[in-house]
A protein has these predicted regions:
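Core catalytic region of metal-dependent phosphoesterases/phosphodiesterases
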Residues: 2, 6-86, 189, 228
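Binuclear metal-dependent phosphoesterase catalytic core
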Residues: 62-64, 84-87, 196-201, 213-250
Length: 250
């Protein structure tokens, strides 16, 4: 049995559909976050898609789904600090990004963006007087895009899991930015210690992350750790028995 793994859809539902339809023998798919379009829309894939949140999502809709409202067809959100059965595999999730100023906040206390709070009062739609805020500005303002310590600790206590899904990468995760005229390429460690802590505690058979829009393979304390590129470029097919994976170009 094969399972598909994708990352950073960002509303490119055509690319997601193309990947799924290319492999009719793959019954289940997983995603490491950033599913929504810029307008906050979500897909209805033809196969079940188990996903964690990224930092670019419709957080009002996620809050509603976490409160019990039904998700679109075949979408299955794995909440932070929980695990789900994906076929024969136990898959844990820690979505969103790290922000030191919000890390000690309770997840329930992370504030919504200003535009989100306004829409909660007014209802959805283009009502006159709605705030003139771009979708990107709103997402940056919405602190629900982050994970917090209580969710990290919940993840660490989940016990044996086969696959850990995170949006952020573990540390070290060295990136070299594209060179600019007159400037040296900037080399930085974009990994997060909190993700490393979860990896060390859980020791999953496989770790998958995204966020950085590139394909990078590493081994961390014996655990294969793969950053999946965004869906318009590639995705993974994973053997559910061995967790051996293949990168598939779009």
């Amino acid at each position: 049995m094969l399972i598909g793994a994708v990352a950073d859809i960002h509303g490119n539902f055509d690319a997601l559909t193309a990947a799924i339809e290319r492999h009719p023998d793959v019954p289940l798919w997983i995603c490491v976050g950033d599913v929504a379009s810029r307008t906050g829309a979500y897909p209805e894939p033809s196969r079940p898609l188990y996903w964690i949140k990224g930092n670019n999502e419709n957080f009002d809709r996620i809050a509603a789904w976490e409160a019990g409202e039904p998700q679109p067809r075949n979408l299955h959100l794995i909440r932070n600090g929980t695990a789900a059965a994906v076929g024969p595999l136990r898959v844990a999730g820690l979505g969103g990004t790290f922000a030191p100023t919000w890390f000690e906040t309770r997840a329930a206390d992370l504030p919504a963006g200003k535009a989100s709070r306004s829409r909660l009062r007014q209802g959805y739609g283009g009502q006159e007087g709605a705030p003139d805020v771009s979708p990107d500005d709103e997402k940056r303002d919405d602190k629900r895009r982050h994970f917090v310590r209580e969710e990290v600790e919940a993840c660490k206590g989940l016990g044996p899991v086969d696959i850990l899904l995170t949006h952020e990468a573990a540390r070290p995760f060295i990136l070299v930015d594209e060179p600019r005229p007159g400037a040296k390429p900037r080399r930085r460690d974009a990994g997060k210690p909190a993700i490393s802590d979860v990896l060390a505690a859980l020791k999953p058979r496989l770790h998958l992350c995204g966020h950085h829009h590139r394909f990078i393979e590493t081994i961390r304390d014996g655990v294969p750790s793969v950053c999946i590129d965004r869906i318009n470029r590639s995705y993974l097919l994973i053997d559910a028995s061995t967790l051996a994976y293949r990168r598939m170009d779009q």
